[in-house]
UniProtKB/Swiss-Prot annotation:
Gene that specifies this protein: hisD
Binding-site positions, NAD(+): Y131, Q189, N212
Highest taxon of source: Bacteria
Function noted in UniProt: Catalyzes the sequential NAD-dependent oxidations of L-histidinol to L-histidinaldehyde and then to L-histidine.
Classification lineage: Bacteria, Pseudomonadati, Pseudomonadota, Gammaproteobacteria, Enterobacterales
EC number of this enzyme: 1.1.1.23
Pfam family membership, one: Histidinol_dh
GO cellular component: cytosol
Name the record gives this protein: Histidinol dehydrogenase
Gene Ontology annotations of biological process type: L-histidine biosynthetic process
Source organism of the structure: Buchnera aphidicola subsp. Baizongia pistaciae (strain Bp)
Gene3D superfamilies: 1.20.5.1300, Nitrogenase molybdenum iron protein domain (3.40.50.1980)
Length: 435
């Protein structure tokens, strides 16, 4: 059966229609999911490992002998991973490491005025938990994207959770990243275990990694419950927006369109172009390429959320993209570098004909953990800074204190903070004794 995607003329749409066109599919607006997750969190908090064994038996249909993967199994994992995959993992690891090592924050250390010194020091988050989803295929690349930045900044305790049975590829990727505390537990129960800690799984300070609606809901609830724990971001369905000019390659655009939609039934792909002919050619190519794909059933379901929009000008394409704030933005146009100036909101950008999203998903070195659901308006993709915290430091010498004291006293009196005022006056008195 041929796929039909209607071509939308942006100029002809009302403001209401435009909002509806760029609307994301609603995935987890479900009170039942919220209640199920709440119960799981409570049970794991109260019953610890027992709850994890029970949930693994119920949800994964596996009776575990041990929650923790043995060191020997991790070390021996390379015996079960073929040489080609090992080589590919090594290429990806090296590129990710190179890019993320360059993200180290500039140290601020300045004398604001004579005698007043300010600086920032950067410290790693001590304990982090990495969640790697299970499902139909091992997400080896996600292990690399999370583990490498954590190791670069020096997080002291790094643990990894993934639903059983954990594949040898995931164990191997963890091993070469130096991760040896691996636990075969998944879903909302894994998030709860890392948040509260159990006899086997240590409590962490921050949880990273994508997952299904139950994992996402668990991260949301846990983040609201605990002050000493945070999360990286709430991952929604994968999405792509492609801006293409008259000379763009329809075959390549169709392949990018389809590659995004195979992630899941709620994935969304949008093409925005001033060329009606290109739009028609892309639809034609989608039908040709779809026939040969193994996940065409998933793609056919996600097609209902996909859009092809024809604009009057190329600049209008960028206006639409900034409204949508895509996770992945492809600019398949001439002089794509020069067009970067028009991009305000995007998770990750792929410039030119040869830059497939798949390259960033795996090996270019940039991180593929990106803001979705429009959160690229205010959020960034994962960097080493997500595994660190910045602490401000200040030091005043005697003259520095004297010079700023009147301003501090004046401002603290305006705010009626007389104890603040007193803390300065006591130091001024102590200065008299020093002299």
């Amino acid at each position: 059966m041929e796929v039909y995607i209607p071509i939308i003329y942006w100029k002809s749409c009302s403001e209401k229609e435009k909002r509806e066109i760029l609307f994301r599919p609603v995935v987890n607006d479900n009170s039942q999911i919220k209640e199920v997750v709440k119960e799981i969190i409570t049970n794991v908090k109260n019953s610890g490992d027992k709850a994890l064994y029970d949930y693994t038996k119920t949800f994964d249909k596996i009776r575990l002998e041990s929650i923790q993967v043995s060191y020997g199994e991790i070390v021996d994992s390379d015996s079960f991973v073929n040489e080609e995959i090992q080589k590919s993992i090594s290429v990806a690891k090296n590129n990710i490491k190179i890019f993320h090592e360059k993200q180290t924050h500039n140290v601020v250390n300045i004398e604001i005025q004579p005698g007043v010194f300010c600086r920032q020091i950067i410290r790693p988050i001590q304990s982090v938990g990495l969640y790697i989803p299970g499902g139909c295929a091992p997400l080896v690349s996600t292990v690399l994207m999370l583990a490498i930045p954590a190791k670069i900044v020096g997080c002291k305790n790094i643990i990894l959770c993934s639903p059983p049975p954990i594949t040898k590829e995931i164990l191997y990727a963890s091993k070469i990243c130096g991760i040896h505390n691996i636990f075969q537990v998944g879903g909302a129960q894994a998030i709860a275990a890392m948040a509260f800690g159990t006899k086997t799984i240590p409590k962490v300070n921050k949880i990273f990694g994508p997952g299904n609606v139950y994992v996402t809901e668990a991260k949301l609830q846990i983040n609201a419950l605990l002050n000493d724990l945070s999360i990286d971001m709430l991952a929604g369905p994968s999405e792509i927006l492609i801006i293409a000019d008259f000379k763009a390659n329809a075959c390549i655009i169709a392949s990018d369109f389809l590659s995004q939609m195979e992630h899941g039934i709620y994935s969304q792909a949008i093409l925005v172009t001033p060329s009606y002919d290109l739009a028609c050619n892309v639809i034609f190519e989608i039908n040709i390429q779809l026939k040969n794909l193994s996940r065409k059933k998933v793609i056919n379901k996600s097609l209902k959320y996909s859009r092809i929009i024809v604009t009057k000008t190329l600049l209008e394409c960028f206006e639409i993209s900034n409204l949508y704030a895509p996770e992945h933005l492809i600019i398949q146009c001439e002089n794509s570098n020069r067009l970067l100036v028009y991009v305000i909101n995007a998770g990750s950008i792929f410039l030119g004909r040869w830059s497939a999203v798949a390259s960033g998903d795996y090996v270019t070195g940039t991180n593929h953990v990106l803001p979705t659901y429009g959160s690229a308006i205010v959020n960034s993709g994962l960097t080493v800074m997500d595994f660190q915290k910045i602490i401000s430091v200040q030091k005043l010498d005697q003259q520095g204190l004297i010079d700023v004291s009147s301003s501090i006293i004046s401002l603290s009196e305006v705010e009626r903070m007389d104890a603040h005022t007193n803390s300065i006056k006591q130091r001024l008195i102590a200065l008299q004794d020093v002299k």
